Amino acid sequence: MEIPGSLCKKVKLSNNAQNWGMQRATNVTYQAHHVSRNKRGQVVGTRGGFRGCTVWLTGLSGAGKTTVSMALEEYLVCHGIPCYTLDGDNIRQGLNKNLGFSPEDREENVRRIAEVAKLFADAGLVCITSFISPYTQDRNNARQIHEGASLPFFEVFVDAPLHVCEQRDVKGLYKKARAGEIKGFTGIDSEYEKPEAPELVLKTDSCDVNDCVQQVVELLQERDIVPVDASYEVKELYVPENKLHLAKTDAETLPALKINKVDMQWVQVLAEGWATPLNGFMREREYLQCLHFDCLLDGGVINLSVPIVLTATHEDKERLDGCTAFALMYEGRRVAILRNPEFFEHRKEERCARQWGTTCKNHPYIKMVMEQGDWLIGGDLQVLDRVYWNDGLDQYRLTPTELKQKFKDMNADAVFAFQLRNPVHNGHALLMQDTHKQLLERGYRRPVLLLHPLGGWTKDDDVPLMWRMKQHAAVLEEGVLNPETTVVAIFPSPMMYAGPTEVQWHCRARMVAGANFYIVGRDPAGMPHPETGKDLYEPSHGAKVLTMAPGLITLEIVPFRVAAYNKKKKRMDYYDSEHHEDFEFISGTRMRKLAREGQKPPEGFMAPKAWTVLTEYYKSLEKA
């Protein structure tokens, strides 16, 4: 908020400076730019297109202008829309620090801001201004400055009753104004002229910040400033309830393609919207973009690094090619319809070389690919019913839409996600605890952890999902992670062990579910080379790639140093090469060996109850 009256020391201006708005130079000629706005729009931001405009937030001190403006700025930047906020307090500390709060100075304050905002808008940015700007004429002048330059101007009245603004008065300025300690305070002894015909009114006494931001975004979408697809709404592929009976009847009459369990897991991924904006299994154009660029490029740069494809044999192609639709059948049940199918060659070796960086047939997922059909099928997917596995864990399989709602219900102002396919040890917990601490230090009040184990296919020697979920529950029970600020859910994707390529998929899927931050540690989505036993991928590359990956714009990557067991401190700690002798690296192989033999790990490596779950799992294998 702007601080008026005696709280702002007014600097005495020279005569020339005092009258500068009245002087007119005769030797100044406007210079036209060589770069057009359309050309500038091609290189500003990640989506292309000129979006320059000004969103002018006006309202009483304490109405919520700064809160809305900063949240709107964050939203737009995270969705690839370049923007910048000019805040009243900030500007009065620099450009306008020589202005006070007289009517004349308020007028000059607004004029300067309008001119600067016009330049920002002309550069292709969405310029958000957050000023009391109490006078109608001054705001009209700001509009005229923009209209004279053929730039859109949107006046947004941030409307909160005076008594609400006084209740929010964390700096006590209204109290001082009521006591006469501040003179000329807007709303108390200086008039605020409400906008007569603003483009938008935000009732901040009854709407939360997110609702206000969405209202402004919708306005900008209506005026073709922000593309509709920039909001990354989750695209679920379930048939709507009112069309379900007809679709099921249709499915029974269509030819069918049998699919396996991994295919069904990908059906679930698509149906729930994890692969937004895909309409179904990738068509050839999408497949090639994914394979060669790790992105979808139609409608902006959208990170999608792993092919989500359906395979078919030559016999299936001969039978189904030419059909306008066919059903997908899993375990004798028709679960989905694929419409307008497109068949194209499944070049397996090329796919594996690009996706995994190897064609080693002993790699578990590559082995599956090499055994699949020689054709790929893309098409629009309609899933008939929600996917349930009836394994006692379906309550953890929350969709992106459900997760977003849960975070909202928890009043989360930051969501940080942790992907894992292994049991949680205290090194993992250290990363999550430190992230929570960092977010609090950055000013977030309610950061929430999404502990999100992968729930699709994994290789044979990985701990099964059921046991991992029991182990995660024990970690929470022992208080290693805070149950009050942690959401445990299952991510339905199969595991591909594709290293830096796959970790981008893991990250962007959590982005769709509402995560703002993504924790990445050592060798994400990696595994030992099936033949040499060495790391298939350089362990630090996954984190490095994520920090550079295009299209992951709505969340921030949180890379961490390697955690190892500190023998002196008897706990997991960040590895320090200068004290190498103090550290011990406990590999997954050794951890499994200890658990299998019923031995205890070093003190502080894992929560005791969580370790007990692991030993019980390996004992169950011996009995089997």
UniProtKB/Swiss-Prot annotation:
InterPro entries: APS_kinase, ATP-Sase_PUA-like_dom, P-loop_NTPase, PUA-like_sf, Rossmann-like_a/b/a_fold, Sulfurylase_cat_dom, Sulphate_adenylyltransferase. The modification N6-acetyllysine is found at K12. SUPFAM superfamilies: Nucleotidylyl transferase (SSF52374), P-loop containing nucleoside triphosphate hydrolases (SSF52540), PUA domain-like (SSF88697). Pfam families: APS_kinase, ATP-sulfurylase, PUA_2. GO terms for cellular component: cytosol; nucleus. Inhibited by chlorate. The kinase activity is subject to inhibition by the substrate adenylyl sulfate. It catalyses: sulfate + ATP + H(+) = adenosine 5'-phosphosulfate + diphosphate; adenosine 5'-phosphosulfate + ATP = 3'-phosphoadenylyl sulfate + ADP + H(+). ATP 1 binds at G62, A63, G64, K65, T66, T67, C207, C212. It is an enzyme of class 2 (transferase). Adenosine 5'-phosphosulfate binds at D89, N90, I91, R92, F101, R106, E107, E108, N109, I132, S133, K171, G184, F185. NCBIfam families: apsK (TIGR00455), PRK03846.1 (NF003013), sopT (TIGR00339). In the N-terminal section; belongs to the APS kinase family. This is Bifunctional 3'-phosphoadenosine 5'-phosphosulfate synthase 1. The lineage of its organism: Eukaryota, Metazoa, Chordata, Craniata, Vertebrata. The gene is PAPSS1.
